[in-house]
Amino acid sequence: MASQGTKRSYEQMETGGERQNATEIRASVGGMVGGIGRFYIQMCTELKLSDYEGRLIQNSITIERMVLSAFDERRNKYLEEHPSAGKDPKKTGGPIYRRRDGKWMRELILYDKEEIRRIWRQANNGEDATAGLTHLMIWHSNLNDATYQRTRALVRTGMDPRMCSLMQGSTLPRRSGAAGAAVKGVGTMVMELIRMIKRGINDRNFWRGENGRRTRIAYERMCNILKGKFQTAAQRAMMDQVRESRNPGNAEIEDLIFLARSALILRGSVAHKSCLPACVYGLVVASGYDFEREGYSLVGIDPFRLLQNSQVFSLIRPNENPAHKSQLVWMACHSAAFEDLRVSSFIRGTRVVPRGQLSTRGVQIASNENMETMDSSTLELRSKYWAIRTRSGGNTNQQRASAGQISVQPTFSVQRNLPFERATIMAAFTGNTEGRTSDMRTEIIRMMESARPEDVSFQGRGVFELSDEKATNPVVPSFDMSNEGSYFFGDNAEEYDN
């Protein structure tokens, strides 16, 4: 966005800071990832993990989940008040994988949440370091975005499964704060709002009384977050209507679904940040690097540089392709699940294939999977170029939004056209233009019809060599303009289930 007036950058959101200059932001983000690294090293010591085991992404995820669970106040309170059989509300744990006699073994560990909180605070100068926790949540969310499809969730709320490119951050927990809200896609916000409205329709007391007042405040806040993602006046005006509705019901659901569809062409601004697994930060801290002193950014060259020199391993199931597993994790690390495959492939320097062609399941291993046949391999997370992550939807100029494509929400600020099948998208817009939002709907449809698939977005923006840390010589790639690349076409991945 050109107007950086009152907006805080995402690093500021990420670190909970007020307005800071670039150096202060780099230092506080550095402090945040440094804290994650120190925590990870300490956990590896506690668990007596070997160097190799500490670089295993599955172990990293277990350790990350433990600290997130230890700080989940709401759930902890709930567990204490509703004791369930065999679940100790004061403990947290998960599978840790160890190498024994040339084989991988699974060991289930349990820790006091209090102990985990102590280690985390100790690694973060005695503070709760909520920003670091949110950072881990966003990494898990990015991994889910790359791994699972949300078709069922979309259909349940009355949306079209082809709108999956709008679903970034759909598995983020509610407590992920401003940094979490920034990375949520338009579809994710719409889905949260629809669920809320549906509860209100079914439960007479949802909007009533003291609780109802809090619910109403949450509803309006979510509406404002979504409004802030839209870049055209008509879309924003429609959001005002939805927010101000006295008694939100089916009319509002209709409006929200209309807005979600419109976002396929008039794209919303959704932040992208490269959040890496804790073990990567741990490796770097262990090598003596001082993140806080050197500074760090989630949207520049830094994450690329870290991945360039970090060796991370993953468990591999018998019929999985290690190269495909690497692609999945690479996409998750750069929050590129909804990026155009042409752009991702160019940056990565190897062809990034659509998910329907991947021979790999998710990164996490279920507790009933057989460890006897598990192997491990190095994840190839390096890239050929780096590019700046974007916060815009790639609309060509501020007011008139540009072409979009079913299934692209740009991650990298790199010049390209955003091809789309206008007929497919516009077919969804027949019918209802009456009612109180008719003029806005008409205006939105008019803008969508005038969008051209050959329009170039991010004009003049290119990728950079990894040696070019100041981003002085952009390499502007040329893409085959006709051939769009969406990760989710012809998809057969499994659903995300909590």
UniProtKB/Swiss-Prot annotation:
Motif Unconventional nuclear localization signal per record, residues: 1-18
Subcellular location(s) of the protein: Virion; Host nucleus
State the span of motif (Bipartite nuclear localization signal).
198-216
Which residue intervals make up region (Disordered)? 1-21
* PTM field: Late in virus-infected cells, may be cleaved from a 56-kDa protein to a 53-kDa protein by a cellular caspase. This cleavage might be a marker for the onset of apoptosis in infected cells or have a specific function in virus host interaction.
A GO molecular function term, named singly, is: RNA binding
InterPro entries recorded: Flu_NP
- Location, primary (coarse class): virion
Q: Name one Pfam family in it.
A: Flu_NP
* One GO CC annotation: host cell nucleus
GO biological process terms, alphabetically, are: symbiont entry into host cell; viral penetration into host nucleus
Q: Which UniProt keywords apply?
A: Capsid protein, Helical capsid protein, Host nucleus, Host-virus interaction, Ribonucleoprotein, RNA-binding, Viral nucleoprotein, Viral penetration into host nucleus, Virion, Virus entry into host cell
The record's section on HAMAP family has: INFV_NCAP (MF_04070)
Subunit structure as annotated in this protein's UniProt entry: Homomultimerizes to form the nucleocapsid. May bind host exportin-1/XPO1. Binds to viral genomic RNA. Protein-RNA contacts are mediated by a combination of electrostatic interactions between positively charged residues and the phosphate backbone and planar interactions between aromatic side chains and bases.
Question: Which family does the record assign?
Answer: Belongs to the influenza viruses nucleoprotein family.
- Describe the task this protein carries out: Encapsidates the negative strand viral RNA, protecting it from nucleases. The encapsidated genomic RNA is termed the ribonucleoprotein (RNP) and serves as template for transcription and replication. The RNP needs to be localized in the host nucleus to start an infectious cycle, but is too large to diffuse through the nuclear pore complex. NP comprises at least 2 nuclear localization signals that are responsible for the active RNP import into the nucleus through cellular importin alpha/beta pathway.
Instruction: Write down what this protein is called.
Output: Nucleoprotein
Name the source organism: Influenza A virus (strain A/Swine/Germany/2/1981 H1N1)
